[in-house]
Amino acid sequence: MPPRGGAIAERALRDADIVQEKDGRLYAMSGYSGLSVIDVSRRDGLRVLGTRRMYGTPVAMYLRDGVLYALFSGWRHVVPDAQGGASRREFMSRVEALDVSDPAEIQPVGSFDLPGKLTEARLAGGVLHAVTYEHGSCFGCAAAPNTTVTSLAVGDPADIAVIDQRRFIESAPSGYWGWPSVSVSDDRMYVASATWNGGEEAGRATIQVVDISDPGGALVEGARVEVTGQIASPWQVDEHDGVLRFVSLPGPWQPDARPGIQTFSIVSSQEIVPLGATELDVHPAAALRSVRFDGDRAYVIAEYADAVLTVDLSDAASPAEVGEIGGTRWINHVEPRGDRLFAFGAHNEAADGTTLHVALFDVSDLANPTMLERVDFGGRDARVVEEHDRIHEAFAFFDGLGTLAVPYSEPSSEASSWDCRTRTAGIQLIDFTRDTLAKRGAAATRGPARRVLASGERLVAVSDVGVEAFGIEDGGAPAKVADIALATLADSTVAVDDIVVRIGGASLEIAPAASPGLAEPIARLDGAALYTDAPGCQRYLGNARLFAHGQHVYVLAQTGNAAFTRLAIVDVGDPAAPRVVAQRDLPFSPGALYANPSGALVSAGDSVVQAGSTLVIRGVSDDGYYAFEEDRPPHEAWLDLLDLSDPLNPRHSSVALPDGAGHTGLQLDGTTVLVSRWTPLPDDPSRARFYLDRIDVADPSSPVVRAPVNVPGSLLAFDGASSRLLTTDYETVETPVVGREACARAFASNAAFTPAAAGDDAGPGVCRGTRRTLKLLDLGDTSAQLLDESPMDDTAAVMKALAGENRAFLSVEDAGHDGRSSILVAGGLQEGSLNTATQEVAGFDPSYGPLLLADGARLLVVDNYWPTLSVLDATDLTALSFETKSELPGYVYHVTLSGERALCSWGYGLEAVDVGP
């Protein structure tokens, strides 16, 4: 939480940071992994004592008598539909009380939900004061935008209850500008807000006072103070010795005004009397970066200014700007410590390219501050890790050690190209005395450190992904003595026997198949090992595709050159010691790994298929975005073949595919690759002839392209045992309609309206669109015979299609029924008779990137709108079964199977969901 300066929060208001240490235990909250309790009592070790998965944005944490109060915004709620339809997910704020006396068995004790976004909270005794903002459309919120202050009784964590509440309605909700800013003192809360209609009328800013001095939790509405300018940050407000003072910014309705300081006498919470005011010597265009109050002083940092302004507040009725601190550039943060001031910022002056600095100033004479010393560190384009309003929480002083720790990140100095630049994280140590600074070494950290703590002679760094401990007693560079992971980084996975290989955070990790989501893996292979000749390019691993054969994992990923794809082969025969046995760049674009046809064409294949130790990648010349269609090159297609039978010597070859105007994705039958294409008719380019091509890749060095077969439509599914083929055929039809909107609803694909009267889009006319038909064929060596067919609804837009076993699955959105979603299943290939069935999917939103995975007669459905994993069992087409197996914690990027469990990768986590019968 932002610091409150001066006398603010001096009594029983407890520290609310999301990381705390007590009695040798570290309590850390993360939006990715929830709560972790770590034993930090040993100098050379760290040990996870317990965890608790919680999904929300952590705001604050309080620890008292073995109970931890965790405060969240964005806490997920699943709300059942009153009519029995699909449930929906909503978000609120939440207070969660947890018994952490036994970290191995963290137990929920009680909870309380608050509508809106939690912006501020303070605990005093048995009372928790919480401030939420309700924007009017949030779940459970009041109709009008408002800021609500609530006092909660938390003395009995099992019975958290409202004591009192005050709601402040925004006076001009349609013109509301920005979030409210909340500042807290011992006895009062100050809720600052601004309203402006965006026009010529002047806006206004106010500070609403709320008295919170009652130890029983009663809230008393105090004065509403009109102020000049706006208060956009809690840094700007402070209460000291009965005086309210703040630095205000010009509002957007005050383009020529300057920032200023205003002071008020606090007679009582209900009576706030103006005392004094002064403008600051800052250009109107310079936004306020930060303010630090320190007793009778204030330090004001303006954006794009080269100085920190010093303000004398000893005479509250006559605040005065008295000096400035120069000799630095771009100050991010200042830390007053008596008559000394530490300033942290950035510059571009150093000859060695360093861009960050810490400076020490003597401010005993506020009118004439003097720089005593400055230490530069960090490489070019280095930057602070923490966001501005929380920078003070990462900027850590260890007075007992005389050491200052500053987390930062910088571009890798070893990047092989600009495109491969990645950022590395570290913590710079600086020794300090009253008058000196001395640069020490830097500790390299796995992730950007959010908090830094001192524990004995150790420095403990906490990031979103882990905790690391460094020895700092030798006066030189810190030495890492222990580290543990808190979050599982997983962008994609592949199962290999009894292990799971996952990629995330520019690393390749090995986890047991029994516990694939373990934060601490069996082994971790730094992504740099897959790019030894291209340093920094491991940043692209997050988009890699993974394949496995035997004890080897094949990794296909981007490089710093868009014309090449990186291949790495990793031997995981010894899960504790994975090793890269081959790596090289292949001469084709990584776009080929993901590209598939879209639009009106129904294509059920993939861009990459695997036949044992052979990978086959479909390449086309005209994939990608072109600003002008005339710039798109002529369509050509080919297959890139990777023979990986000798992992130490991977071989690449390619074979051209027969000419066509376009090609579908690839399917595989044994060692035969199937792909369909279409060619426009010479005498009628609006019509096309489709062909099925088969390429035998049993010997990838000599692929055999078999004779094409003319088939009605594009490839949807193939059954090798019966040699039967399912296609989607296309026909252009016309129908009379009234109005362009009716035409758009009549056809899902290529709908074009021609009005009977030119320009009359609402009148009668002709609608031209594409009609599609599913067709089942017997496939021979050179010809195909039609067995059965089934027309599709004209309004059914196929969003995605997959081939299963003896059936195909099509995700459909109905253009004629308000986007109703369903899954169409077409089966009967082996039987020779086409059967279809439809499963409606309530609440499913295809625009949110759903993931579909065909598994025999089942389809796994990841709905990323309200993240859930469901299974459609189409074993019996007369009795489809659709069951939601699990809610998911976040947006899922990749799903694969490991036995009877679906592995759902969502970037900062891996969820294993049982999808068995």
Language-model-detected regions and their locations in the chain:
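Feature marking well-ordered beta-strand scaffolds used for ligand recognition
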Residues: M1-P917
